[in-house]
Regions:
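N-terminal pre-domains immediately preceding structured catalytic cores
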Residues: 2-198
Length: 198
């Protein structure tokens, strides 16, 4: 005769094992790191052309240079030897696009956000200040562009990658901006142009 307690105990062990396996599998698939607060924001699958990848890229710029091609919705980090690391980005909406040459002036993890007065005038419902964290529109990291109000930053809206939606900043999913943040030092040259170099 089967011992009921032993059978129930065995079922609990099997159920716990399955739960741990599923949880571990989900965490690996979602690429959830050990860093507190850096949650996976890739709950939506980015289109293949918006996913981080190494690509062929001809340029005369030095390795380490960032080139942003706004019409393509891509940010390139020049690697040299005709290659670049490409990230999908969200860019400025109509009336908020720009081109130029700047340098990364500073970097911040989980940056606070204070919308500039011009943005408050256009969108008076915005908060006047928001502390850094998962709900902050700047996301997990920010790389500040010169003395401007523009940044390369994460987002709390990964569904906007590949679109023209911002007020002139460039947004990446949090996993990508954290990767970029670790690769790029302050002082890095950033070129913003309509199209990539051909």
């Amino acid at each position: 005769m089967i011992n009921i307690r032993r059978l129930l105990g065995l079922q609990l062990v099997v159920a716990a094992g399955l739960l741990l396996s599923i949880t571990h599998s989900f965490a690996q698939k979602a690429d959830i790191g050990d860093e507190p607060g850096l949650i996976a924001d890739d709950s939506i699958e980015l289109p293949p052309d918006m996913q981080k990848q190494m690509v062929l890229y001809r340029t005369t710029e030095a390795p380490g240079t960032i080139i942003i091609a706004t019409s393509e919705r891509h940010l390139y980090v020049v690697q040299g030897n005709g290659r670049a690391l490409r990230y999908g980005i969200g860019v400025g909406r109509d009336g908020f696009t720009w081109q130029g040459l700047l340098k990364i002036s500073r970097k911040a993890e989980w940056p606070d956000w204070t919308p500039p007065p011009e943005m408050i005038a256009r969108q008076p419902y915005l908060p006047r200040f928001m502390a850094g964290g998962p709900g902050n529109p700047l996301g997990a990291r920010a790389l500040y562009l010169g003395a401007t109000v523009y940044r390369i930053h994460g987002t709390n809206r990964p569904d906007t990658i590949g679109t023209a939606v911002s007020s002139g900043c460039f947004r990446l999913v949090n996993a990508d901006v954290a990767d970029l943040y670790d690769r790029i030092p302050v002082g890095t040259k950033v070129i913003v142009r309509q199209k990539p170099e051909i």
